[in-house]
Amino acid sequence: MHHGGGGGAIRVLNVAEKPSVAKSVAEILSRPSGGMRSREGRSRYNRVFEFDYSIGGRACHMLVTSVTGHLMELEFDDRFRRWHSCDPADLFHAPVRKSVPQDKQDIKRTLEEEARKCQWLVLWLDCDREGENIAYEVIDICAGANSRLNIWRARFSALIDREIHEAVQHLDRPNKLFADAVDARQEIDLRIGASFTRFQTMLLKDAFVLDDTGDDRNIILSYGPCQFPTLGFIVERFWEIQAHEPEEFWTINCSHTSDEGTASFGWIRGHLFDYSSAVVIYEMCVEEPMATVQNVRNQEKLKYPPYPLSTIELQKRASRYFRMSSEHTMKVAEELYQAGFISYPRTETDNFSPNTDLHSIVHEQVAHPNWGTYAQRLLDPEARLWRNPSNGGHDDKAHPPIHPTKFSAGETNWTDNHKKLYELVVRHFLACCSQPAVGAETTVEIDIAGEQFNASGRVVLAKNYLDVYRFDSWGGTLLPTYIIGQQFVPTTLTLDSGMTRPPPLLAEADLLGCMDKAGIGTDATMHDHIKKLLDRCYATKDANTRFSPTNLGEALVMGYDEMGYELWKPYLRSMMEADMKSVSIGTKSKSEVLENCLQQMKACFLDARANKVKLFDAMGTFFARSSRPVNETQNSIETVRPCAACNESEMFLKQRPTGEFMVGCRGFPQCRNVVWLPRSLSGAAVTDQVCPTCAPGPVYKIQFKFRRRDIPPNFDVDHLGCIGGCDDILKELMELSRFGSHSQTATPARNQSQTASGVRQGSSRQDLHTSFHPAVQFTNGQTPVVNPQGFRSTHTQSSGNASGQVQCTSCREPCVLRTANTEANRGRKFYKCQNLACGFFAWEDDVENSAPRGRGGRGRGGRSSSRQSSASASAGRRGGTQGRGRRGRGRNADGMMFVAATGEPVYGSCFICGDPTHFANVCPNLGR
């Protein structure tokens, strides 16, 4: 046999999705030419098969090899792959790339080497969207090695001779839209999953004891956009059961026994929850117990066979009939498909094409010992059992419904589950082609004392499809004969009570139905989402295949539910799935769907992060707090800017256990650069807005929320600010707010006043609440008078001295005059103590209104003096700076220097023990 491909033969590289499929395709196509030869490729698991064949009358030398599922992986650039390398919010827009992982490099090399020697590339990947995406991964590799390749797509639904030969003789072009839809889904899932997973894990893992054994350091609290709505169905049903309060009800039951049997009549009202009303009606019936037959209805009823078998129905029925998990069902179905016994098991289609030769498929089953006789009857025209399958209304345009493709009485290597699933597929197919079952149903209605009761009975006249489909039953009871007007006294007439019951936990078939109805996942991925919930310990499944949430699963759903965001509901994912379907049919572009979905989910992410306390509260309901060092708990890691001190790491926003906010370098402890934010903050979150002024950048703006009691009344509590030094409003707010122990300057000199010393050495906790109406003294020595606003003012006796200077009564130092730059108070003057640790503040006009003015009013000289004092004080504060965030050898060299959010250095040491390596709030001697 000639294998060289000479004589004008076209060399054709055929690529299948799995090695077993490649072997089956090669065996089928090589039979006419007398066989094939096999050799190893670069990967020992993916062999290359060679043989001669004819396509469209043209001689071809065929080379058949395979990949093993997806050849490429989508991943973030290296600088974003480490968990602490970036703010999780950055992952919504971080660069991604698709590349061949190391463990598949051998497959890649095989494809490249073979592609260089071929003229055609024929893709035998699974004929669904996922398979089309893998096909384009193969195209990228092969076309990169040989750009002149003529690329074709083989479309098939079963690994049988007829299908494979038909596919290779009617080659098509690959569908880029299908591949784009999968690309969009992969990128959306990667970005959403990675961002929420990092957020949840870093926020909660080290903060709580999640594992009773204590070995929970490697736990990943994953979030998946399909996985979480699936968990939501389980939790929602669980909550519904927990919220159910049993309620007693009462109903009247009646029975009548005659020579023909017993009939049980039910009350038309069903039941009543009011006992008194039920007793009154029951007593009426007991007093007048004669029953009168008011109506007798006899009608023919039909029970129709099921629709042709789709993937979701296969999973649901296997779960219901055999208690097989959806994940195991798909594994067994895939093995049956690859062995050629059933058609492709991943399909949404539930109607057969008119061109399908259904009789031939039935004919293959006539030899089976269990259902062969039924198959013969089905093909017999005189039996009148044949009926074309019903149309279920779904067609994915890729594959037919699941049906048998090869006869088997049971292979020696089959497990019980292989036998059960093959039997289900065959019996389901035979049932689809059968007449419905026929029954005669009788309904009898009676009246007792004005109350209506009825009873129903059924007799099956022709079982038809029920003869082969043993999984369905259609029983009934035979009623005695009644005629209209007949009267009788009931044999029993009772008032019975019962209790309402909650719905049961979701079974796997029910869960699959919920997912299918809500559009969560696809027929090929639903089982995988369920498996992940079990693997991640978010849910458990009992022996009856019913699901319950674990404490961890319930806590996460509860946390998001408390936020008010329906991230655990199916609506968002359902919209995404609809968008991806739109990409696959060309009504929306991949870029459009990516932009819309990621923009929506990033907004949800930022909102969730801003309300992370809800997650903490929910987790605290189920889990004990961890005793691990708080430094390991990454409660909030949000990148603000590159560190200008070490030029190596990022600076990030973090909230300490005490509630304070800081911006520190990730390079700690090698780099100790830190910005202490004021303790008047109640919240802070980094936004995605970049400051256009500050460098080195990017410098992300922070959304600050101040406590109203700790800032002047005319400032907004919400402020979008920049810590890079350009934000004048933020500087004012910083200067007007107490910093507590973190912002204290060097230890006060001995010659300072006792008042000032007292302020400095007071409790760092008691000193936080700044009064914005403190005492005021003028330097002209006048006696202060307290005004209604709480200020002290001095009455001037002469106009020439009317502009007395404002003095801080705590520090006894002249105040500086500043100008507000906020929207509400732009241009308004205020007095501020020169001492950064002092919280003195007063509006200029309030001070003026509290004291009589001379005819000349305040002179300009006073303002000039204040400005000079302000400039001098500011210059004095800057004098000792020797770099940001480093320990300096300038003023107070024995202490530590930090950078305040105003951009100015802050020196200090612990005022309790004098240690320069920490401040008093973390001093081990605190409280002794």
From Swiss-Prot:
**Positions annotated as zinc finger (CCHC-type):** 909-925
Q: Which GO terms describe its biological process?
A: DNA recombination; DNA repair; DNA topological change
Q: Where is this region: Interaction with DNA?
A: 222-227
**Where's the Toprim domain?**
11-157
Biased amino acid composition, Polar residues:
741-765, 777-806
EC number assigned by the record: 5.6.2.1
Q: Where are the zinc fingers (GRF-type)?
A: 808-847
InterPro entries in the cross-refs: Topo_IA, Topo_IA_2, Topo_IA_AS, Topo_IA_cen, Topo_IA_cen_sub1, Topo_IA_cen_sub2, Topo_IA_cen_sub3, Topo_IA_core_domain
Please give the catalytic activity noted in the UniProt record. Answer: ATP-independent breakage of single-stranded DNA, followed by passage and rejoining
Any coiled-coil regions, as ranges: none
Residues of the region (Disordered) are 389-410, 741-806, 849-892
GO CC annotation: nucleus; RecQ family helicase-topoisomerase III complex
- Co-factor requirement: Mg(2+)
Does the UniProt entry include the keyword Isomerase?
A: yes
Instruction: Offer an example of a GO molecular function term for this protein.
Output: DNA binding
What's noted on cofactor binding?
A: Binds two Mg(2+) ions per subunit.
Q: Where does Zn(2+) bind?
A: C808, C811, C833, C838
**Protein name as annotated:** DNA topoisomerase 3-alpha
Coding gene?
TOP3A
